[in-house]
Every structure is written in structure tokens, then in C-alpha cells.
């Protein structure tokens, strides 16, 4: 696995977590911390 692939995976994970946080008000407060 190349460094570029790792960075891409991390970006996808971050976007996924952000989407979850945006969809759940209670969790959103914790995710912004």
C-alpha cells in the first residue's frame, strides 16, 4: 500500500465520520471536540 493510498483511505474515513456526525445531533457535539 502506498502513502497516497493511505492518505486517500484516511480522507474517506474522515468524510464518513463527518457524515455520521452531521446526521446525528447528539454525536455531532462529540465529534467537534
Curated annotation (Swiss-Prot):
Entry keyword Translocase:
no
Oligomer and partners: Heterodimer composed of subunit LS2 and subunit SS1, heterodimer composed of subunit LS2 and SS2, and heterodimer composed of subunit LS2 and SS3; disulfide-linked.
User: Beyond the main fields, what else does the record say?
Assistant: There are 6 heterodimeric myrmexins which consist of a small subunit (SS1 or SS2 or SS3) disulfide-linked to a larger, quite structurally unrelated subunit (LS1 or LS2).
- Output a single Gene Ontology CC term carried by this record: extracellular region
Q: In which tissues is it expressed?
A: Expressed by the venom gland.
Q: Where in the cell is it found?
A: Secreted
Instruction: Identify the keywords attached in UniProt to this record, alphabetized.
Output: Disulfide bond, Secreted
What is the residue range of the signal peptide feature?
none
Q: What is this protein called?
A: U1-pseudomyrmecitoxin-Pt1 subunit LS2
Which family does the similarity line name? Belongs to the myrmexin family.
* Coiled coil ranges: none
Top-level taxon of the source organism: Eukaryota
Summary of the function given for this chain in its UniProt record: This heterodimer may have anti-inflammatory properties, since the myrmexin complex (composed of 6 SS-LS heterodimers) inhibits carrageenin-induced edema in a dose-dependent manner (after subcutaneous injection into rats).
